[in-house]
Amino acid sequence: MPASILIADDYDDNRELLRLMLETEGYHIREARNGHEALDAAMAEVPAAALIDLSMPSLDGWGLLRALRADSRTRSIPCVAVTAFAATQDRQRALEAGFDAYISKPFRAKELLELVSGILRKGAGEDAHKDGDGR
């Protein structure tokens, strides 16, 4: 079964681009237009990973991350900050806030796919270790 990826971004074009890039690799995609929709989607069906735009209206990416990390069901979802902010301090702030990875727009499909593949492998390794199967 393909891994489920949640994309949270308020711009339709951004969600479509991310979806197309990820679907070519066989990922199952769920989309949300804002942080509230993304939180509801994650609670209904916990995704293998989430790509989160930091600058969404209503509940932004920072608030969404805090909400996901506060709930035991969604706490361990690997979360990637997706943003137009490319400064080193922006990346550092996102990682310190609890994002597992950071990617700035614009990016290449290969860069995104390698990042997603890496966080899914890392997440699978941590899950196996938590279940007692990791050695």
Which residues does each predicted region cover?
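Short hydrophobic/Thr-rich beta-strand motif most characteristic of the beta2 strand and flanking loop
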Residues: 26-33, 41-42
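Active-site beta3 strand of CheY-like receiver
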Residues: 45-51
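Receiver (REC) domain active-site loop signature in two-component systems and cognate sites
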Residues: 56
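Charged docking surfaces used in two-component/phosphorelay signaling
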Residues: 16-24
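C-terminal output helix
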Residues: 107-116
